[in-house]
Amino acid sequence: LAYIGGSITQGAGAAPINTECYAYKSYQLFQKRFSAKNNVKFIKAGVGGTPSELGMIRFDRDVLRDGQQPDIVVIEFAVNDEGDETKGDCYESLVRKVLNLPWKPAVILLFSVFANDWNLQDRLSPVGKLYDLPMVSVLDAVSPQFALKNDEGRVITKNQFFYDMFHPGNAGHSVMADCIEYLFEKIDQAGHASLNAFELGLTEEKILQEKLNLAPVIGNSFENIRLLDKKDIYAKAYIDEGGFDSTDTQLQSVEMDDQLSLTPEFPYNWMYDGTKNTLNRVKAYFELEMECRALLLVFKDSGEVNVGKAKVYVDGEYHFTADPHINNWQHCNAVIIFNNKTSENHVVRIEIAEEDRDKQFTILGFGYVL
């Protein structure tokens, strides 16, 4: 069982974070229901404050690490994707990326909820409907009963469910796990072939494949996205790292799987450090040349005063400025540099703003679609 998502999947609000989070609890419930030998493996890859725009880039590294082939993947980004530039294209791309894996894992879409009874399930649920995926809505499960009194059928109050505005506490994580267990129960009771399998003579896998051949409901621009960093180099990419010759070790780190220890995200990065090396200030740029259809930059946000801005140019034209202080806390930020219809050769230059040459900036990696 694998789980990918934001801070709720990471376990925020649960104590201890590794065993009281919904992911671990639902994995235990799955094992209790289906496993006779306690031989179910648990993969957890939640990263706080990050949307599916980052999730689709880090999926291979974080979920499929060490040759893992999960049979079930739970995707939880319904409260993280408000800032998604593509309004759902990244989410559907991630879903399709998982569904298209050679061993055909099952996918569950999980819609968490904030304390103001908000999530993005109205935007994202059409993706589940198109591919006939099971969807678990925590909003539908808990929000309607919050307004009731005890004698009217209220099961849990908002204060009991939530640790803060954005994250469930231990009780909330337990309820989320119960919601997923309810899905397991329903699936366990259901027949293993859908009605269509008898009518059309097709297996469920073939029906899914036909749906994957249909036009996406939002978009699939990034379903073949790959990660490019110092570890996963693309042979046909030409890189001039310029002054980005250091490696940043002060990174957003998360509790993976059932561990309490922290694992850094994107450790194979390129860091410009103008605080130590004055020679670097002469070469305050990084250049990447490659043929691709789409390219995303992943850079490090930070609240530190010694971190500066970088300007992003494509083929000599200014596109945008990457500013770590907009979010102002240490975390991974994925932004689209370009997303085109056809693949062409481009030169991307990332240049430290002139007034920030004595500061630091970290390129965590790139996501690219050929």
Which sequence ranges carry the predicted segments?
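Conserved catalytic region of serine esterases and O-acyltransferases that act on ester linkages
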Residues: 174-370
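Serine-esterase "nucleophile elbow" of acetyl-processing enzymes
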Residues: 1-45, 58-69, 297, 342, ...
